[in-house]
């Protein structure tokens, strides 16, 4: 099953932008499986499009994540503080992948 992930992180103290587009076919089988499991664990396709924080801080990271799988496409925007715990590991992993280039 094909899956594509577009990921962007902005904000933080330095205001650095980290962005990447990941085609699952370009990853190792283990990495692809792990990412897919993280997307499933977060119930990503059921999440609201915008997850707002009750206390928005200017130096928080903002995340924008789009996942395309089969006929489905869903985008979620969330701040660090607002992101549900199920999304945190996915954001961390994608940030690492984005930095790896």
Predicted regions and their residues:
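Function-determining sites in protein domains
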Residues: 1-101
């Amino acid at each position: 099953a094909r899956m594509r992930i577009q990921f962007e992180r902005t904000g933080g103290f330095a205001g650095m932008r980290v962005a990447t587009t990941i085609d699952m076919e370009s990853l190792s089988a283990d990495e692809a499986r792990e990412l897919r499991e993280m997307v499933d664990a977060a119930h990503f396709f059921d999440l609201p499009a915008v997850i707002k924080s009750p206390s928005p801080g200017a130096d928080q990271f903002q995340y924008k994540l789009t996942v395309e799988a089969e006929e489905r496409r869903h985008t979620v925007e969330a701040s660090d503080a607002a992101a549900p715990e199920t999304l945190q590991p996915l954001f961390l992993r994608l940030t690492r992948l984005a930095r790896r280039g």
